Amino acid sequence: MYDLTGKHVCYVADCGGIALETSKVLMTKNIAKLAVLQSVENQPAIAQLQSIKHSTQIFFWTFDVTMARQEMKKYFDEVMVQMDYIDVLINGATLCDERNIDATINTNLTGMMNTVATVLPYMDRKMGGSGGLIVNVTSVIGLDPSPVFCAYSASKFGVIGFTRSLADPLYYTQNGVAVMAVCCGPTKVFVDRELNAFLEYGQTFADRLRCAPCQSTASCGQNIVTAIERSENGQIWIADKGGLEMVTLHWYWHMADQFLSYMQSTDDDNQEQFVSGRR
């Protein structure tokens, strides 16, 4: 179990919907500090969070997840003055706009990766940090394809690939930063928006999604925090229909294990086995 007591948590997302409900639950876990980084100021939401736990320090910054990494570095230098250190980084910024592929990819994937690359040095044990946990909040259509929201699905598949890659022991054993993801199923705040399909053939299905059964943002937020508390490095969870399920991960490339051994080995025989395909 991952104990959130006394932790310094940084949440990159819009402070509404899933992010707000997740933050409400976090505030009941006796965290010491919560940094909320979002695109639009939402003081009523911040006040609502503060009312849950007065002793927890809450800091707010207006943040554009699509900014260049160089700008992010300057930004987080200021954030760290208030936070001192970050134990948990939660990436929850999301956009589903099939008519604006660049914005969808930049928000959901590129921006998230730049945020991680910027924050990791502050957490890295070999760079003076204390280790910690990175949580990427993503979607179930990052596990299974969506014929309706093709660009959104592609961006979320990228989040899963990035999460699994960064969770490799090659990194974790050195920097002490665990990486996990929570894939949210259809949630009310998402289906309430105007949604456009990637191609017009799918628009009927996009319109029907408004009436489809979906979980509440409160239920999803609760399960995101539960997944964090149960987390181990590299785990992928599904938060859907009020439940929580851990994903069984698979290696589809039959030489993946040999490739990793080859990367880590200086033995000529092992390298020859990889090239020849022998086990």
UniProtKB/Swiss-Prot annotation:
The active site is at Y152. One of its GO terms (cellular component) is cytoplasm. NAD(+) binds at residues 11-34. InterPro entries: ADH-rel, NAD(P)-bd_dom_sf, Sc_DH/Rdtase_CS, SDR_fam. One of its GO terms (molecular function) is oxidoreductase activity. Substrate binds at S139. It holds the Pfam family adh_short. Gene3D superfamilies: NAD(P)-binding Rossmann-like Domain (3.40.50.720). It comes from the Eukaryota. The keyword Oxidoreductase applies. Keywords: Oxidoreductase. PANTHER family: 15-HYDROXYPROSTAGLANDIN DEHYDROGENASE [NAD(+)], ALCOHOL DEHYDROGENASE-RELATED. Belongs to the short-chain dehydrogenases/reductases (SDR) family. This is Alcohol dehydrogenase-related 31 kDa protein. It comes from Drosophila guanche.
